[in-house]
Structure formats: C-alpha cells, structure tokens
C-alpha cells in the first residue's frame, strides 16, 4: 500500500501556520512538503478570478462585503491576515508552477467558463484538477475541456454507504466525466473505496486534521488526504512508512532502512530540493 497524496487545504492553513488561501499559506505548504495545493475560486464584480472560500470578505479579512458586488481593487485593499492580500488566481498558478499541482474548487457554476479559460491562458492544464460539489459544474468543465482531470465533491451522505450506494456513486462520478471522488472523511468505508478502485476512480478524503483519522484513512487505502495541517500529516505518514504499514513512494524508498532522525534529515533535503526547482 502506498501513502496517499498530501493535499494542503487552502494551503498550510491550520492554526499557527498561515492565513487560509493566501500566497503565504501556499508557500508554507510547499516548504513543509506537499503533493498538491487545494484552493477555492470566486469571481469579483468586475469579472476577475480570485482565491477565496467564502462569498464575502467578512470571515477571512478585515473588510466586509460580498465578493460578487465588489471590484478587484476594493478586495485587494483588504488584509487577509498577517498583511497578506486576497490573491488572484494567476498569482497562485505562478507560485505553484513546476512545484505542485493545484486542486481547484469552483465555488459557483456560472464561472466554469472563466476558470477553464484562465487555466488555458496560464498554460496550466497539466498541473490542475478541477472540482465542485455541483455535478453539473463538473460536467460543464469536462464539456469545455475534456482533457482536464476533474473531481466530484461529496459531503455527508444520508446513511453509511452500502455497496449498492457505492455503485450508484461510481455511476454518478463516471457519468459526469470525473475520475476522482473527493468525499467527507467521516463518510468513508473500505467497501466504498474498493468499489471506486474497481472502476479506476481515485478517492480523496477531506478535511482530515486529527492524527488518528489520518492514520486510519491512510491504512484504509484512500489515495489522497486533504488537511489544514500538512506538517502533522507528514509525520503520520513517515511513522507509517517506518513501521512498514505503507510503502514509501519511489523517491523515498532509499530511506526505508535508515533511522528516524536520519530519515527526517533526508526528507528535509528532498523538500528543499523540490522547493528550489
């Protein structure tokens, strides 16, 4: 069993790390060592794509206002924490280019065309996965850009997914052209993961911030873990690799027979090299 992808939710945005969905949070995640950055995209009143989770500035900045009713210049005046500004999408593409892929959540169906266009203009299509809670949005993206990988987001299911329910989910994912299911971690079962795997669908779990949940889900076989604490996830996965419960990725297998501290030193060197590329 190989370890799951380490996906930084809104960057390294956990308490004590960095303000969510900011360039600082994404840079922090990359310096810690992750496989992918998760971001949220919205559009301003003047048609500019920005990286922000909420429909308003109220929770994450020192300003108030509905994003859709504001122009970019107004939004950029807001402090998103520690002096950071709300980034535009192109800035995040530029930061992540050749460093890590982006898991891009479209927050509103009507901006699908804008997002696809922005990805094309930035020549970023080989480094992005598009996702949405709305199946129609995913389907729309796949019609516009069949080459883009896509993920369907699922929240809490009404019941624990039976094998029949799992097969229905498989059909839904395949019908809209997605190749990944991003699902709330508490809903996951081994049978659901197995049904998805049989049909070639990857399963990514969100948002996983507790060590015990990280460990259990990695052992369950999920292919991706979305977390606000990539530093904690790295430690959990390292422990699982040291104990032989998961197989290190090819780039880390040479570390398998070394001591704990030697491995950590080597992992830091690998992360520093990746950061410099």
Language-model features: locations:
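Phosphate-group recognition and catalysis centered on beta-loop-alpha active-site segments
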Residues: 1-277
């Amino acid at each position: 069993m190989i370890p799951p992808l380490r996906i930084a939710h809104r960057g390294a945005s956990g308490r004590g790390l960095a303000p969510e969905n900011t360039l600082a949070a994404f840079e922090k995640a990359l310096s810690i060592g992750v496989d992918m950055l998760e971001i949220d995209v919205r559009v301003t009143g003047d048609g500019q794509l920005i990286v922000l989770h909420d429909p308003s500035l109220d929770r994450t900045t020192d300003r108030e206002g509905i994003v859709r009713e504001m122009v970019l210049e107004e939004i950029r005046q807001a402090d998103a924490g520690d002096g950071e500004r709300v980034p535009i999408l192109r800035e995040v593409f530029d930061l992540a280019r050749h460093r890590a892929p982006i898991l891009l959540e479209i927050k509103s169906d009507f901006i699908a065309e804008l997002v696809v266009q922005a990805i094309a203009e930035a020549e970023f299509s080989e480094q992005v996965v598009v996702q949405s809670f709305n199946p129609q949005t995913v389907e729309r993206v796949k019609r516009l850009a069949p080459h883009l990988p896509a993920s369907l987001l699922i929240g809490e299911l009404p019941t624990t997914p039976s094998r029949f329910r799992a097969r229905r989910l498989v059909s839904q994912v395949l019908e809209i052209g997605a190749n990944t299911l991003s699902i709330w971690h508490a809903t996951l079962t081994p049978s659901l993961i197995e049904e998805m795997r049989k049909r070639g669908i990857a399963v990514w779990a969100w948002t996983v911030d507790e060590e015990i949940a990280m460990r259990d889900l990695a052992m369950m076989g999920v292919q991706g873990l979305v977390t606000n604490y990539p530093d904690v996830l790295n430690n959990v996965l390292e422990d699982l690799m040291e104990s032989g419960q998961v197989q290190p990725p090819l780039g880390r297998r040479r570390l398998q027979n070394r001591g704990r501290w030697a491995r950590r030193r080597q992992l830091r060197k690998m992360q520093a090299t990746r950061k410099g590329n």
